[in-house]
Regions:
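Ribosome large-subunit tunnel/peptidyl-transferase-proximal elements
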Residues: 1-103, 109-113, 131-142
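Internal, active-site/partner-interface "lid" segment
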Residues: 114-134
Length: 142
């Protein structure tokens, strides 16, 4: 009997919706990253993109524990000298909560080419409404 190896022909992708309201951003990001990679499937293969589609709603209502709203920064760099831009998470959560959640999920994923394809299946919304009703996503508890 040979070992099962997942490939594009034998992967079944499901849709999951995660409600982030009142839950820590890190715990929500860990669950989303595991679903995107397919680590909670029996057919998980590390080198293959065998994960599911994930929808995160209420990203603006996710919580950061401790003083992270004031002490944690989102940093980007343009590549030029003096091109570092810093934004406190308090401001980032008010203006772009989807970006804050995407950065958290990306930080929980490995740094490889499978991650790039997996993150394309991540859909994040600040509010409760989402556009993927036709896919009939299953609710997933954190």
């Amino acid at each position: 009997m040979s070992t099962f190896m997942a490939n594009k022909g034998n992967i079944e992708r499901k849709w999951y919706v995660i409600d982030a309201a009142g839950k820590p951003m890190g715990k929500t990001a860990v669950v989303a990253a595991d679903l995107l990679r397919g680590k909670r499937k029996v057919t998980y293969t590390p080198h293959a993109d065998c994960g599911d589609n994930v929808i995160i709603i209420n990203a603006s209502k996710a919580i950061l524990t401790g003083n992270k709203m004031e002490q944690k920064y989102y940093r980007t760099h343009s590549g030029w000298v003096g091109g570092l831009k810093e934004t406190k998470y308090r401001i980032l959560m008010q203006e772009k909560p989807e970006l804050a959640m995407r950065v958290a999920v990306r930080g929980m994923m490995p740094r490889n080419t499978v991650t790039k394809d997996s993150l394309k299946r991540l859909h994040i919304y600040a509010g409760e409404a989402h556009e993927q009703q036709a896919q009939k996503p299953e609710a997933y508890e954190v």
